[in-house]
Amino acid sequence: MYSVKEIFYTLQGEGAQSGRAAVFCRFSGCNLWSGREEDRLSADCHFCDTDFVGTDGSNGGKYESPSSLAEAVEEQWLSYDLARRYVVCTGGEPLLQLDSDLIAEFHKRGFDVAIETNGTIDVPKGVDWVCVSPKGHVAVRVRQGDELKLVYPQNGVNPSKYLSWEFDHFFIQPKDGLDVDLNTELSIKFCKENPRWRLGLQTHKVIGVE
């Protein structure tokens, strides 16, 4: 049984795959925050900007089997050209639910499988693109992948600690919220002073897509 908040077709708005057409499969639940506002300040991740609670989003629900969920994702793919299909498994924390059987069903339908994870749970074999976004001082198990995205700034977190990890791309993303303008200035300054890092923006918010 898979609990899914929403499934929708859009453009990837962040990171090295920015601009690529994708079906987003947002799983319900997270191991770093309940999703309830009354728990935010005490959560291991208190700056999340995503609603991952429940199954009431577009195409959300309880999916009984890997094939039923993969079919629901496939139905959202609107392109009929020869481009490789792409599904982004996100959350919440997708690795609480994503497993090898579901990955195999996605592959059977011609999808590359990407995940956006906090890195606290090992990645199943078969995932094609791994994006890890460390949160605060939470221990990270996944120290290799395709890209590391650090929301910045985070109290007491020095980005340099991550540069020894095995990732192809390192992104600094300004923390959203009331201080987003200041955080953007700080992120730009940091990237100019530390050019191994690239500035990562949430372009889907800039252009007004989901």
Which residues fall in each region the model found?
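Short loop segments at secondary-structure junctions
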Residues: 28-30, 135
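Conserved Radical SAM active-site core
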Residues: 2-9, 21, 32-127
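Conserved AdoMet/S-adenosylmethionine-binding subsite of the radical SAM
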Residues: 82-86, 94-210
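Generic secondary-structure boundary/loop-capping signal
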Residues: 1, 8, 200-204
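N-terminal nucleotide/polyanion-binding subdomain common to many enzyme families
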Residues: 1-5, 16, 28
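A generic structural micro-feature
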Residues: 17-19, 142
